[in-house]
Design a protein with these regions (language model features):
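Conserved substrate/cofactor phosphate-moiety recognition/catalytic segment
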Residues: 13-68, 105-106
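Short, surface-exposed, polar/charged, turn-prone segments marking secondary-structure boundaries
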Residues: 34-36, 55-57, 97-99, 124-129
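Glycine-rich phosphate-binding loop used to anchor ATP phosphates in small-molecule kinases
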Residues: 46-102
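Short, glycine/charged-enriched secondary-structure capping and boundary segments
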Residues: 21-22, 42-44, 83-86, 111-114
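A structure-centric signal for secondary-structure junctions around beta-strands
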Residues: 1-2, 94
Length: 193
C-alpha cells in the first residue's frame, strides 16, 4: 500500500538525513521551502507564505502517484500529526510515523548549531538565522510523544542521533589509483608478405 510518512523530531535529530537516503520518496519540507524560495533558514515575516506553500505541497504530494510521500518537519504536536493521519486516509495511504531521538538534549543542540555554521559557510546567498537555546528548549517542552492511538499504522523509532547530519556531507572516501598494466605491444602485421 502507498504510504504517508510523518517524520517526528527536534531540529538536528536526523530527519532530513533519514529522508535523503530515500531517493524515491516525494518529500515536502518547510526548510526546503524557506531556503529555496525565500533564502532564509527562518524568518517570521515570511512564515505565513511558507505555511501556505507547504500546506498546498503536502496535499498535492498526497494526491500524487508517488508510492511514498514524506513530511519532513518537526511534527512535535499531536494535532499536527492527526491532520496528516486524516489526509493519509483520505488519499488512500498508510500513515507511518518515524520518531527521532531527542536525548541527549545538549548534544542535539550542539549538533544543530554545528549544522547552522556549516550551512552559513557553504552558502553565500542564504541568510542563516540564529537559533537560540531558549527557542530550542521551548520546542522540547511542547513536544508530545507519538502514541499508538493517534492512528498511525506503524510507529518506527530511530535510536541514535545522526553521525552525519542532513546538512553535512560525508567525508569522501579516498580512491585507490589504478595502474594500467604495461604490456609490450607488438605491431599487427597487416601487410605481411
Amino acid at each position: 500500500m502507498r504510504q504517508f510518512v510523518v517524520l517526528v523530531g527536534l531540529p538536528g535529530s536526523g530527519k532530513t538525513a533519514y529522508q535523503q537516503k530515500k531517493s524515491k520518496w516525494a518529500v515536502v519540507s518547510r526548510d526546503v521551502i524557506r531556503q529555496s524560495i525565500f533564502g532564509h533558514t527562518y524568518e517570521p515575516a515570511v512564515e505565513d507564505a511558507v505555511e501556505r506553500i507547504f500546506s498546498t505541497a503536502v496535499i498535492e504530494a498526497a494526491e500524487s502517484s508517488a508510492d511514498t510521500v514524506c513530511v519532513d518537519d518537526l511534527n512535535l504536536l499531536r494535532n499536527e500529526r492527526s491532520a496528516y493521519v486524516e489526509l493519509a486516509r483520505i488519499t488512500g495511504r498508510e500513515p507511518v510515523a518515524v520518531v527521532f531521538p531527542y536525548d541527549p538534549v545538549d548534544e542535539l543542540y550542539r549538533l544543530v548549531q554545528h549544522q547552522l555554521e556549516e550551512l552559513k559557510a557553504s552558502s553565500t546567498r542564504l541568510h542563516v538565522s540564529a537559533f537560540p537555546r531558549d527557542r530550542f528548549d521551548a520546542m522540547l517542552r511542547c513536544y508530545q510523544a507519538v502514541h499508538p492511538d493517534e492512528g498511525f499504522v506503524r510507529i518506527l523509532k530511530e535510536d541514535a542521533l545522526p553521525i552525519v547530519s542532513g546538512i553535512t556531507a560525508p567525508e569522501p572516501v579516498p580512491r585507490k589509483e589504478r595502474k594500467r598494466r604495461q604490456e609490450k605491444q607488438h605491431p599487427i602485421p597487416l601487410f605481411a608478405g
